[in-house]
């Protein structure tokens, strides 16, 4: 059926693109094709545990937190409130794009309500995974789970907090709490490096920070076309995936509502991406896994390795 692009302004909706399997379905390729049709590309969940591979001007790029419309100067790229951000990884990703001549600052906006991943979140992730032994869930060790735990536990730091003169005090309070928790893991050695993280936070302050829920709805009222870009896949949804071997956010289309601040009746087309065969990284049930030479051949010829972790 024809795509809904010329509808009346009052009926403008947010289209959603997401994976229907366990991630690595090829969402980046589809986003690359769809991006020219939209004015705004918005991430609504996940963080640097995601990896979208796309090709621009003949060069392959892997984006982890930044939306996939960043290579198009006329497209606004929004990191929504449902996303968790590691300032260090975020800065490195932006620096790499700037080196390629991309005007990231001119086309990127970050929600003040997005939560920050602290260095101690990554340490807690590693300590928790190590303590599980054979029962580990296959975490990417990016600190995603502990960050969402602090979010729901109402302890987290948000991007908007970096604008406060009391930010460093609040950071050290949460950091010290994490250090006390890390001390409870037997035999886990760690060292907290604050300097690089705080430097990356200072860089984050130079970027455009917005109240994304208001900006999204203003864009809709202005008749702008918006694509919500999902990460991971449906089978990794925190509620409806193969729990507990899942991610820590809602990867389904409804996640776009809470992750961007839009009403359910504002969701338009939903593009579900899947490939001819399933793949999965990490732990968890995988009923159709091929564990012989054929499986190895499919993995090799299909380059089936996680875009973020490189895991087969």
PLM regions: where:
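Short, Lys/Arg-enriched N-terminal segments with co-localized hydrophobic residues
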Residues: 1-11
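Non-transmembrane, aqueous-exposed alpha-helical and coiled segments at domain scale
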Residues: 12-312
